[in-house]
Amino acid sequence: MDAKQVLVMAATMLTAMGAPVFAQHAREPYVRVAEIEIDPAQLGAYTAAVKEQIEAAIRLETGVLALYSVADKDNPAHILVFEMYADTDAYKAHLETAHFKKYKVATQDMVKSLKLRETIPILLGSKSR
C-alpha cells in the first residue's frame, strides 16, 4: 500500500468520532494532511511523541475534531497525519497549546522533511466502532 492509499484510508476511517460528521455549508471544518519523513533511527521516539500529542489534543481541545497518524507500511519512517479542526481558529489555537509546542520541540531533530497539504472537504463521514 502506497502513501496515497494510506491517506485515502485515513480520510475514510474517521471512526474515532462517536456520530456521523458531515461538512457543513455555513462552517466547514479545516482539514489538512501532514506528510512527515522521520529519521528511521528515531522512529520509536517520534511515535511516542506523536501519540502523546494526539491524545492530549483530542482530550483537551474541543476544536480538534480528529487527528490520525499512520505510517506507510513499506516505509514506516514516512508518516501521514490527517488533521480535522472545527475551523481555522481552532487550528490556530491548537498551535499555541503547551502539548503541541512540547511535541514540536521534542521532534524537531527527528523530522527530516515536512509537507503540509491544505485540503477541501468533499464529504467527511464516520460511524461508531
Language-model-detected regions and their locations in the chain:
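Glycine-rich beta-strand-turn "strand-cap" elements at beta-sheet edges
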Residues: 2-7, 13-31, 68-77, 104-129
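N-terminal targeting signals for Sec/Tat export/insertion, comprising classic cleavable signal peptides
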Residues: 30-60
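Short, well-ordered beta-strand segments in beta-rich or mixed alpha/beta enzyme
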Residues: 29-37, 66-95
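An amphipathic, aromatic/His-enriched active-site/gating alpha helix that lines ligand/cofactor pockets
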Residues: 6-7, 25, 52-66, 84-118
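Intrinsically disordered, low-complexity acidic/polar segments
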Residues: 43-45, 78, 90, 125
